[in-house]
């Protein structure tokens, strides 16, 4: 098991978060780790081109009881049997790969009514698909590569003159369809928001006409 522990330590060294903090690791190795799919220690072994992994057996506990010095003493009082420890099988860690998973999304109050605070939302949270998981190196992050937006109806409950008033409000939800390990940057949803802002600002700005002198 010591050899497996050494292999895990070696793998953790290769999976360091940035090259600047690991000057002894070649950049091409980090790039290869970032692009590769690693599902097990065997995959890591093949990727790092490690030919074989040995196994060392733990030393067996001594069956001789402490305090036994002579055969005569053993004959008079036999030692109690010492239980033999059995090696436990330790399972291999399963990586949480970058993919879509169902997560709980709490509906922001600003999406229902940004001008008021005295109301309730039902349901207060829903299930959506989002990209979660980890990548082989921290230089890349699990990000959505394709998104989808859908609208749902929620109930807005407020009290007017001590009487409950219910109103249905549409809320826009974002679903992640595909994920990828990529460098940290603005995702497709951010690019869409920025494009919308540019369009709005373009409408507000008008070119000034120069009067002839």
Curated annotation (Swiss-Prot):
CDD domains: PDGF
GO function term, MF aspect, one: growth factor activity
GO biological process terms held by the UniProt record: negative chemotaxis; negative regulation of phosphatidylinositol biosynthetic process; negative regulation of platelet activation; platelet-derived growth factor receptor signaling pathway; positive regulation of cell division; positive regulation of cell migration; positive regulation of cell population proliferation; positive regulation of ERK1 and ERK2 cascade
Region (Receptor binding site): 158-162
InterPro entries for the chain: Cystine-knot_cytokine, PD_growth_factor_CS, PDGF/VEGF_dom, PDGF_N
Pfam family, one: PDGF
Protein name: Platelet-derived growth factor subunit A
Species the sequence originates in: Oryctolagus cuniculus (Rabbit)
Gene from which the chain derives: PDGFA
């Amino acid at each position: 098991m010591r050899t497996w522990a050494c292999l895990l330590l070696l793998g953790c060294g290769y999976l360091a978060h940035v090259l600047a903090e690991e000057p002894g690791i070649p950049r091409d190795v980090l790039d290869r780790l970032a692009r590769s799919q690693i599902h097990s220690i065997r995959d890591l072994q093949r990727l790092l081109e490690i030919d074989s992994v040995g196994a060392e057996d733990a030393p067996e506990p001594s069956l001789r009881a402490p305090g036994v010095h002579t055969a005569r003493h053993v004959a008079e009082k036999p030692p109690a049997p010492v239980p033999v420890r059995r090696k436990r099988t330790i399972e291999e860690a399963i990586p949480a790969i970058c993919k879509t998973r169902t997560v709980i999304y709490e509906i922001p109050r600003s999406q229902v009514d940004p001008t008021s605070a005295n109301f309730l939302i039902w349901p207060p949270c829903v299930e959506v698909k989002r990209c979660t998981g980890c990548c082989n190196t921290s230089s890349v992050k699990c990000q959505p590569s394709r998104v989808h937006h859908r609208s749902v109806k929620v109930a807005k409950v407020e009290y007017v003159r001590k009487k409950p008033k219910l109103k249905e409000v549409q809320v826009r939800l974002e679903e992640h369809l595909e994920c990828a390990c990529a460098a940290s940057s603005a995702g497709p949803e951010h690019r869409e928001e920025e494009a919308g802002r540019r369009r709005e600002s373009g409408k507000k700005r008008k070119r000034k006409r120069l009067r002839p002198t």
